[in-house]
């Protein structure tokens, strides 16, 4: 038990050291299309970087299309990219990401593409330069998984789906 705990502690320390090394002020980005725009945050303090379309794409009612952004990024080890929906597109036009959030692994170097789904009863056309999603950069933890006979007990236990009440 002690050896196992020590191994976990060493991994946690190594992870923190890695994170301190990867959280820099810059991130390498390649624009892979002439109409590509560098992802940017709309306001200081915003967490997400806007991703824009490099093609005009019409999405039929209840249809799904793959929207290219013309952007590729080099995420450092220990950091993942989450592609998330834009709330305004969802509320005003019924557009969302089919696989929200989309996951970009740090070893992926290809173009970021957005799986946009139209839940509305009318078609929607994405124009070149339209903001179609947001990119959130986040650290992650990827420990080795181990099978145990029983999980440590908590106050909640196995209660889920509505177990905390309505109000």
PLM feature spans:
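DUTPase catalytic domain/fold
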Residues: 2-167
């Amino acid at each position: 038990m002690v050896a196992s705990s020590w191994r976990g502690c060493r991994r946690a320390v190594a992870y923190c050291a890695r994170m301190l090394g990867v959280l820099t002020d810059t991130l390498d980005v390649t624009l892979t299309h002439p109409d590509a725009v560098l992802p940017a945050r709309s306001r200081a303090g915003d967490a997400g970087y806007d991703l824009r379309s490099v093609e005009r794409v019409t999405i039929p009612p209840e249809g799904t299309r793959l929207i290219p952004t013309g952007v590729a990024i080099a995420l450092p080890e220990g950091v993942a990219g989450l592609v998330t929906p834009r709330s305004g597109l969802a509320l005003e036009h019924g557009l969302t990401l089919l696989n929200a959030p989309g996951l970009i692994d740090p070893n992926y170097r290809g173009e970021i593409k957005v799986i946009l789904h139209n839940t509305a009863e009318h078609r929607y056309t994405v124009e070149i330069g339209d903001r179609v999603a947001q990119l959130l950069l986040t650290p992650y933890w990827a420990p080795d998984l181990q099978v145990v006979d029983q999980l440590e007990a908590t106050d909640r236990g196995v209660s889920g789906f509505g177990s905390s009440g309505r109000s």
